[in-house]
Amino acid sequence: MSVKIFNGEFDIPENSRSLYILVIATTDISLIPGLTVAGATPELTHFTPAADAEFLIKGKCSVINTVPVTPNGIPTPAIITRASLEFVKIPRLVVNAGSRIKPNLPLIDLGGEPGGDIRKGSLRKEVAERILNNGVSLGEEFSNSFDFLIIGESIPAGTTTAMAVLVGLGYDALDKVSSASPENPKELKKKIVYEAIKDLPSDLMGKLAKLSDPMLLGVSGIALGFKGKILLAGGTQMTAAAAIIKEFNKNKLKDIAIGTTKWIINDRSSDIIGLAKAVGIPILAAWLDFTNSKFEGLKVYEKGFVKEGVGAGGASIYAMKRGVTNEQILGKVEEIYQRITTNLM
């Protein structure tokens, strides 16, 4: 089966007026060595969201010379997102919730700021409220033109901020979030989260301002304002977005599912199914398979590298639900991969 579902049911509307949104932001904890591989170096992680956005929309990057890569040279999962969306031709839009580097393209800005180090406090409370409220207004506006949203994300180290938010909201999440690396740096993540949740404010917005990254607030706001159905396109981070949404409007979860990849489902170092069940939200997973790829840089997805990001799972699910096969997606991904790796040489 090309798409599997867990924790309940969720139907993507037929002939829906659909929009793909990429919400970008940065957090200063991505600068901590060893925490994330979503960039060739810790410093370059602040360029990754802007570069992902540029590649998704334009097929090339200008804020850095190449597409974002891991330290061992594996390119961004945006190549999967772009490949999948080429089959379905739905509009794509970038929303900046608080990225330190801005992409060179038209976008919608939520008036946010880059996230700081969550051990000291991610955002000022008024900034967190502004991101959330502007997201709600944007979601309401999207309701006038669309009835289905796919919301992807790009924020290096976002699984750590997601863990902090989930723990701060009372969920058992310390050993359950994923990583872009096959070696999930769990002990480092836990150390950061333990420090972050000390002296936590008692009110909800106070907690979110301390722990959340701007992306989670932007995604949650858009979802809260939107009237139709939503696929939160991402891995364990999106369980944190769903948990935030639930805090403000529990009934909204009936219109929402997480859309991810089989690589996140199969990740033994995390538990997205358990997290989603605790929050009360279904998961759809694109059962992509790159085993037979002619490129080693794509085969390594089957070994636990990268796994998800930039809405790769959600975009693939949307394409597969419209009859696109794994082989077609892989063929298009290989075409893009060949082009970008030729440029990398």
UniProtKB/Swiss-Prot annotation:
Cystine crosslinks: none
Gene Ontology terms, MF aspect: nicotinate-nucleotide-dimethylbenzimidazole phosphoribosyltransferase activity
Family classification: Belongs to the UPF0284 family.
Cited HAMAP family: UPF0284 (MF_01086)
Name listed for the protein in its UniProt record: UPF0284 protein STK_21430
Natural source organism: Sulfurisphaera tokodaii (strain DSM 16993 / JCM 10545 / NBRC 100140 / 7) (Sulfolobus tokodaii)
Taxonomic classification: Archaea, Thermoproteota, Thermoprotei, Sulfolobales, Sulfolobaceae
